[in-house]
């Protein structure tokens, strides 16, 4: 399926954003070569300077968009401080983009435990071994830490570190964009004043 074969005009008739996002994500899973769930995550530091990096979306529903990280990392510290974030998905093969922003909440311990158990064993070891976002003296130091935690957790389940969990963005704004000829793109934004409120749909100039 190519971008031209998609029923791109129909998305402007959608009444709410979550089912539309689900449809677009499924299209991306069929067309994007690598990581269709990759998303740019923007946060802000104490000086008001933005930071952005790619993360992987690990779940979404009508409550929000979920990803996981080390809370002691730069993004973890910034999210714990401001409790606000923005995301941008860009699916180049489909010529589509989705932007969203809103307040952030921590997922439940049960959600974090369930996802942590689903990760490959090596990734769970890595969560213990990596002091994310802090200076690393050498690659050998990281590999040594991996070896030490591998030995420590050689038998049985690997517990989730207390500093490792997930965040959920509860969007108050979600914008859908699709490329059109002559840069006359389609843009539709769904807005609500609070995460629990109803959606207002606004068509935007490109």
UniProtKB/Swiss-Prot annotation:
Record keyword Flavoprotein present: yes
GO biological process, one term: pyridoxine biosynthetic process
Binding site for FMN: 53-58, 68-69, 75, 97, 132-133, 177, 187
Binding site residues for substrate: 58, 115, 119, 123, 183-185
Catalytic reactions of this protein: pyridoxamine 5'-phosphate + O2 + H2O = pyridoxal 5'-phosphate + H2O2 + NH4(+); pyridoxine 5'-phosphate + O2 = pyridoxal 5'-phosphate + H2O2
Metabolic or biological pathway, per its Swiss-Prot or TrEMBL entry: Cofactor metabolism; pyridoxal 5'-phosphate salvage; pyridoxal 5'-phosphate from pyridoxamine 5'-phosphate: step 1/1; Cofactor metabolism; pyridoxal 5'-phosphate salvage; pyridoxal 5'-phosphate from pyridoxine 5'-phosphate: step 1/1
EC number: 1.4.3.5
Cofactor(s) the protein requires to work: FMN
PROSITE patterns per record: PYRIDOX_OXIDASE (PS01064)
Entry note: cofactor: Binds 1 FMN per subunit.
Function: Catalyzes the oxidation of either pyridoxine 5'-phosphate (PNP) or pyridoxamine 5'-phosphate (PMP) into pyridoxal 5'-phosphate (PLP).
Similarity remark: Belongs to the pyridoxamine 5'-phosphate oxidase family.
HAMAP family listed in its UniProt record: PdxH
Complex formation: Homodimer.
Protein name listed in UniProt: Pyridoxine/pyridoxamine 5'-phosphate oxidase
Organism of provenance: Sinorhizobium fredii (strain NBRC 101917 / NGR234)
Lineage, opening ranks: Bacteria, Pseudomonadati, Pseudomonadota, Alphaproteobacteria, Hyphomicrobiales
